[in-house]
Amino acid sequence: MQKGTDVVLVTGATGHQGGAVARQLLSQRHRVRALTRKPQGEAAKALAGLGAEVVPGELDDGGSLEKALRGAWGVFSVQNTWEAGVEAEERQGKRLAELARKAGVSHFVYTSVGSAHRRTGIPHFENKARIEETVRGLGFPSYTILRPVFFMENWTSPSFNPSLAEGKLAIGIRADTPLEMIAVEDIGAYGLKAFEQHAELNRREIDIAGDEQTMPETARILGKAMGRSLEFAPVPIEEVRKFSADFAVMLEWFDRVGYDVHIRSRSREFGIPPTSLADWAAKAPWR
């Protein structure tokens, strides 16, 4: 990868993962082409201010993808399950990979999900496993698959946990279940590594995490960062199922099996210090 010459197309550039990867690449003076549906939005303007080339595009619009891929050396591919839905996410991920291969992209980085390869039975894990299969089979000169676990950023999302305002961490996970988590900035660091060390990481499939905590301990850590008392409030899984069958299956899998990242050894291998939940929470934008 030639710094200042090779262009990396980053999809989801104004979202959590894409934004983190774009910022990391830009911090090392790499050329970033940021794909977004809202090129005039504040997040896109912020990336442009850091030096990114912001281009409009939709993952469901093959024409805009073909245009964005022209001359790209690398691609960072991310899709949003909760926004697009399981079937659309799979379609988008496969199409982007196929178009990137057709466009002559040299290195393709796909961000999947932790344990996607383990036959979890979770719909939004299984569809990513099928996208992974597509990436493997296309014959890219090189590719890397990243598999991040549960995002720490989920805790600051009102739609994910509205009960935080009531002093409760409400989720359908057992009190004694340890949950592996990762800060999106750590994903960005691994994304940067995947591009800068593309030869060494060719065909590597890497599960990544930064910390592991039970829900009562998570409530204690988040409450301390928020400056208030926060109580873990377990939610019956059948109540979760009424909201989302997919989400319920995932939570049941967390209790029964769970992610399996060796955090310390992974950190040592890649030279990326893991962000702890406490460190992340201390800097999080609590409202």
Specify the residue positions occupied by each region the protein language model found:
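Oxidoreductase cofactor-interface core, primarily capturing Rossmann-like NAD(P)-dependent enzymes
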Residues: 1-46, 60-63, 67-72, 80-91, ...
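Compositionally biased, low-complexity repeat tracts
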Residues: 8-11, 53, 163, 254, ...
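Short, basic/glycine-rich phosphate-binding loops at helix/coil junctions
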Residues: 75-77, 259
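Short, conserved active-site loop motifs that form the nucleotide-linked donor/cofactor pocket
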Residues: 51-52, 143
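A hydrophobic C-terminal alpha-helical subdomain
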Residues: 24, 225-226, 237-287
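Cofactor-binding loops of NAD(P)H-dependent oxidoreductases
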Residues: 57
